[in-house]
Amino acid sequence: MCSLAAGNGRGAELGPEPLELSDSGDDAGWEDEDADTEPAHGRQHTPCLFCDRLFASAEETFSHCKLEHQFNIDSMVHKHGLEFYGYIKLINFIRLKNPTVEYMNSIYNPVPWEKDEYLKPVLEDDLLLQFDVEDLYEPVSTPFSYPNGLSESASVVEKLKHMEARALSAEAALARAREDLQKMKQFAQDFVMNVDVRTCSSTTTIADLQEDEDGVYFSSYGHYGIHEEMLKDKVRTESYRDFIYQNPHIFKDKVVLDVGCGTGILSMFAAKVGAKKVIAVDQSEILYQAMDIIRLNKLEDTIVLIKGKIEEVSLPVEKVDVIISEWMGYFLLFESMLDSVLYAKSKYLAKGGSVYPDICTISLVAVSDVSKHADRIAFWDDVYGFNMSCMKKAVIPEAVVEVVDHKTLISDPCDIKHIDCHTTSISDLEFSSDFTLRTTKTAMCTAVAGYFDIYFEKNCHNRVVFSTGPQSTKTHWKQTVFLLEKPFPVKAGEALKGKITVHKNKKDPRSLIVTLTLNSSTQTYSLQ
């Protein structure tokens, strides 16, 4: 799943450097310690960086390294200015290359663990990789331990060490001040975005959009490419086909409304199983191709095509028996097309009629993908030798739509929204929800992913369900990923409590603003 991947352990070659990489410890002493290194049943232990002793925590391991091997992780982190990813690389470098303590203490910049290959864990569930390196960034009160042979310059070295400690402390204080300033900016941004949303009329935003405001949305569906992608999505298209073909009683001799018909595929499915009349509505230019498609398949006597927004057109009937639509967007609600379906339901659906799909859920799941997080976030720390870390503040607030590797999941999913299309209203589509993610792996939590499930249930003799989750067959909806600014360690069995708020963006009501609170940290994301 998403636990830290196992590696080849100790004893690997360091590389071309002519260095002695065996530990200077006494082998004979190890056998005497074996009796003390057996882990208690059911407890997680991790080995020392320089010998075979096992410990139950990172703190115990580092204390042992300092006392027995003269390796001070505090000094090492401060000496090289290591943050989250640098620390991860350091630990994996030592695990993989098995260098001596003397070699590690002799290293100056550039360090040998800069490559991204050292982001890959060597030991599964390594407790040292779950240690919060920021805990080490307190004012430095003890000098660094430098190699022997510099005693003749001791006074100069001491002064330099104290100057370096003061510089590091000042740099850390400046970083904290910048972070506080950014939090203030983020708070102001979140406040403005949420006020915008709360003050808008969510029951009419989509219906009230003018042609010049909504033209880009509909023009994007005028090109064949997006329809080709959707039609080739077998999970999507075959689920609709199976629902209609396996439940013909729902459509036979009924009047059907297809909202956002596109190429007309759902309308043709309905016509094939005996619908009396199908009214297909779409505002995009693809409707003209749909007209040709309907004629080619000799269904023009059953299917009536109407170009325009469902909120603006006049239908040739007062009421319909069935409404069908493929309205789902990323994270289910992106594009706000469900608003149009609900509008059609309230205006045109006959008493006792049905809307399909009828049930939808949105779920969240925790993700651990340190390498991908580094690629997206740590990348900006050094771009061809230049510091572009300020770009992180622009990258993190944008939700990412991508396929999540199911092996990176570290929790059970949690439903945050249940929608019954027969009873829900447009105002229900903006919501807040508390959630709890039960972790299944010990790892670093780097992101939260969202997805949705779709159900065709009402009056069905053969129920049809499909999921867009990471553990199901890939769909064109993929998953929506909310990257965490600061990953944090979790242990298997933990209950991660959080809160999510989903609103339309007032300036663009087809896009979403998502505010996520997790691990005492709040971040607002845009999906647009």
UniProtKB/Swiss-Prot annotation:
Q: Where in the cell is the protein located?
A: Cytoplasm, Cytosol; Nucleus
User: Which Gene3D superfamilies does the UniProt entry name for this protein?
Assistant: Hnrnp arginine n-methyltransferase1 (2.70.160.11), Vaccinia Virus protein VP39 (3.40.50.150)
Q: What is its EC number?
A: 2.1.1.319
SAM-dependent MTase PRMT-type domain location is 214-528
Q: Where is this region: Mediates interaction with ALDH1A1?
A: 184-528
- Per the record, residues carrying N-acetylcysteine are C2
Residues at the catalytic site: E326, E335
Pfam families of this UniProt entry? ANM3_C2H2_Zf, ANM3_zf-C2H2, PrmA, PRMT_C
The Gene Ontology biological process terms listed for this entry are:
methylation; negative regulation of protein ubiquitination; negative regulation of retinoic acid biosynthetic process; positive regulation of osteoblast differentiation; transcription initiation-coupled chromatin remodeling
Q: What happens when the gene is disrupted?
A: shRNA-mediated knockdown leads to elevated osteoclast numbers and osteopenia.
Stretch list, region Disordered:
1-43
Q: Where is the composition biased (Acidic residues)?
A: 23-37
A GO term from the CC aspect: nucleus
Signal peptide: which range, if any? none
Which residues are S-adenosyl-L-homocysteine-binding? R236, G260, D282, S284, I310, E311
> Which parts of the sequence are C2H2-type zinc fingers?
46-69
Q: Which UniProt keywords apply?
A: Acetylation, Cytoplasm, Metal-binding, Methyltransferase, Nucleus, Phosphoprotein, S-adenosyl-L-methionine, Transferase, Zinc, Zinc-finger
Q: Which PANTHER family match?
A: PROTEIN ARGININE N-METHYLTRANSFERASE, PROTEIN ARGININE N-METHYLTRANSFERASE 3
By sequence similarity, the record places it as follows: Belongs to the class I-like SAM-binding methyltransferase superfamily. Protein arginine N-methyltransferase family.
The domain-related comment in the record is: The C2H2-type zinc-finger is responsible for substrate specificity.
The UniProt subunit note reads as follows: Monomer and homodimer. Interacts with EPB41L3 (via FERM domain); the interaction is direct and inhibits the protein-arginine N-methyltransferase activity of PRMT3. Interacts with the 40S ribosomal protein RPS2. Interacts with ALDH1A1; the interaction is direct, inhibits ALDH1A1 aldehyde dehydrogenase activity and is independent of the methyltransferase activity of PRMT3.
Q: What does this protein do?
A: Protein-arginine N-methyltransferase that catalyzes both the monomethylation and asymmetric dimethylation of the guanidino nitrogens of arginine residues in target proteins, and therefore falls into the group of type I methyltransferases. Catalyzes the asymmetric arginine dimethylation at multiple sites in the Arg/Gly-rich region of small ribosomal subunit protein uS5/RPS2. Also appears to methylate other ribosomal proteins. May regulate retinoic acid synthesis and signaling by inhibiting ALDH1A1 retinal dehydrogenase activity.
Q: What is this protein called?
A: Protein arginine N-methyltransferase 3
**Species assigned in the record:** Mus musculus
